[in-house]
């Protein structure tokens, strides 16, 4: 799904240790009251569900301070539909905790351009299987977003928009997938209850890595439109 870099050596991470020292200096030494308060608990107003992609760091992008964001990151920033029963529901568990215990006011689903997960979905739609143990099942949730544009006829040939055209314009599916995740959020009963009561706001965002542009969802139907 991504190209390998430096296959014959492990890349150095010592600069991260230096960054921790800088973080400690910036927050613990200059603003000890804030960190003392955070050591006793958190009360972020926003849950953000973002992609694991290294190029879209939510804290950096939003300029957030410690304690401002409750963050979930997964492949392709997907929200699975609500379901009960056995299983490891990592994303659902984080959403439940953020909504029912932390009581966030906002949920942002943040998609982005050049998403590897969506690229894999488009490849699968074109007949190329995703040869990964866990990724294939996970990103299959985004197939509905693809099928908005790829409409099979009776012979099974996709004809509404070609796969090749979508591969050239993956932002269409990336944004549709964000909209799909917003609708999936409303299948969680405690999300819908607070949303219907006006106590929780849902937002869909899509960030263009190349240009820095931001698209945001319409309040009525969750479709994304250019904003910044």
Segments from the language model and where they lie:
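Conserved H-X4-D acyltransferase segment
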Residues: 42-59
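Short beta-strand segments
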Residues: 49-51, 73, 110-112, 203-208
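Structural motif
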Residues: 45-48, 68-70, 105-108
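Divalent-metal-activated hydrolytic enzyme cores
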Residues: 2-44, 77-105, 116-228
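Catalytic core of membrane glycerolipid acyltransferases/transacylases, capturing the structured
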Residues: 55-78
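Gly/Ser/Thr-rich loops at beta-strand to alpha-helix junctions
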Residues: 53-55, 112-117
């Amino acid at each position: 799904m991504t190209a390998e870099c430096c296959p014959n050596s492990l890349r150095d991470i010592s600069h991260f240790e230096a960054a921790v020292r800088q973080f400690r200096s910036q927050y613990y030494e200059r603003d000890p009251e804030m960190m003392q308060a955070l050591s006793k608990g958190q009360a972020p107003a926003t849950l953000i569900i973002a992609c694991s992609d290294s190029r879209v760091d939510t804290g950096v992008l939003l300029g957030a301070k410690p304690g401002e964001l409750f963050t979930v990151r997964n492949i392709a920033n997907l929200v699975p539909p609500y379901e009960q029963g056995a299983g490891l529901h990592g994303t659902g568990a984080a959403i439940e905790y953020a909504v029912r215990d932390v009581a966030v006011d906002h949920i942002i689903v943040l998609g982005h351009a050049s998403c590897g997960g969506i690229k894999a979905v488009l490849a699968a739609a074109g007949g190329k299987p995703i040869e990964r143990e866990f990724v294939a099942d996970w990103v299959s949730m985004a197939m509905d977003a693809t099928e908005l544009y790829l409409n099979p006829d009776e012979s099974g040939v996709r004809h509404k928009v070609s796969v090749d055209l979508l591969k050239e314009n993956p932002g269409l599916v990336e944004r549709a997938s964000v909209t799909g995740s917003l609708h999936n959020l409303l299948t969680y009963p405690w999300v819908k209850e607070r949303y219907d009561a006006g106590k929780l706001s849902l937002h869909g965002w899509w960030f263009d890595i190349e240009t820095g542009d931001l698209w945001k969802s319409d309040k009525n139907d969750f479709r994304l439109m250019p904003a910044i």
